[in-house]
């Protein structure tokens, strides 16, 4: 497990984790930590030293790349006075799928109704009811519990997801759903959507409006004071790449200030990753594409200033606004 001694320094087999490798391939199968494609390696095992029973020499378990662990967020928004109606679709791949589990299953369970139905389809059982694999009484109880979860707890989970994304409660959540749980190779991404209304992202300034477009990528890490000083190597769960595709429909008779749009455009790139923003307007819409990547799971402390530049660029964009004026 994460934080344990290297396997060649252990004195107790209870501290080991057993896994399988499909012979002649680079496919590894570890104990599951949440529902996923079976051959996806949990981050807690990546990069660790391991032994196979048919070999004497140890080897290093493969480490995923940033391109393996992606999130793609599509935001479509419209303005209603100072309120904003938002439809957000989230696609997670690789180990980033762990971040979507909070809206997929009850708090007391590793899997939810969407997982059960997806596994049922994957295993191609003939019977159409996925609950028939359980004893009749258990099936009835599980079915009732999952129905209650979808009606009550999942609604709260999606509301909490919105609150976590914006660090502010939504006015209301009008729709949500899990579109794909990501358990099979031909549909490996975890996908969900949520529709809601927010206040505080649009403010009036006379006849104009100020749109907090930077907040549409969710709250970003900001490092201040002593947090900007580091003496140890940098370690994160995984290398990753995030992407946001934002589209904001403007009210009739309004346009985005070309100058404020231009100020959104930025690119910060170095050996550790990249943060880039490209903004434009047309056909009554503001279109913003944002990308962020951290390319390595570990960085030497010598690269801390480079990492800081990326973190600062992300947090600076969080504060960006677009001026919307009457035509």
Specify the residue positions occupied by each region the protein language model found:
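A sensor for short, sequence-defined functional sites
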Residues: 1-327
């Amino acid at each position: 497990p994460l934080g344990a001694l290297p396997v060649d320094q252990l004195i107790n087999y209870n501290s080991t984790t057993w896994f399988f490798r499909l012979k002649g391939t680079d496919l590894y199968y570890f104990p599951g930590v949440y529902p996923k494609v079976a051959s996806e390696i949990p981050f807690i095992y990546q990069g660790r030293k391991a032994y196979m029973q048919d070999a004497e020499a140890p080897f290093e378990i493969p480490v995923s790349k940033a391109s393996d662990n992606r999130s793609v967020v599509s935001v479509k928004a419209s303005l209603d006075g100072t309120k904003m109606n938002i439809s957000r679709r989230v696609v997670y791949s690789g180990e980033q799928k762990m971040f979507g589990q909070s809206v997929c299953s009850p708090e007391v369970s590793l899997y939810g109704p969407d997982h059960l139905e997806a596994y049922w389809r994957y295993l191609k059982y003939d019977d159409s009811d996925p609950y028939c694999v359980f004893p009749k009484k258990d099936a009835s109880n599980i079915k009732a519990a999952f129905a209650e979860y979808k009606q009550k707890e999942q609604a709260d989970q999606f509301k909490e997801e919105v609150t976590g994304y914006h660090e502010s409660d939504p006015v209301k959540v009008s729709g949500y759903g899990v579109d794909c749980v990501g358990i099979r190779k031909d549909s490996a991404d975890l996908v969900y959507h949520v529709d809601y209304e927010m206040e505080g992202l649009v403010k009036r300034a006379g006849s104009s409006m100020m749109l907090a477009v930077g907040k549409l990528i969710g709250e970003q890490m900001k490092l201040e004071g002593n947090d900007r000083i580091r003496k140890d190597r940098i370690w994160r769960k995984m290398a990753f790449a995030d992407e946001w595709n934002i589209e904001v429909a403007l009210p009739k008779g309004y346009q985005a200030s070309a100058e404020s749009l231009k100020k959104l455009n930025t690119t910060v790139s170095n050996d550790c990753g990249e943060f880039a923003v490209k903004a434009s307007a047309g056909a009554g819409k503001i279109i913003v594409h944002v990308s962020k990547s951290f390319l390595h799971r570990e960085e030497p402390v010598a690269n801390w200033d480079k990492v800081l530049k990326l973190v600062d660029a992300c947090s600076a964009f969080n504060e960006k606004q677009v001026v919307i004026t009457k035509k």
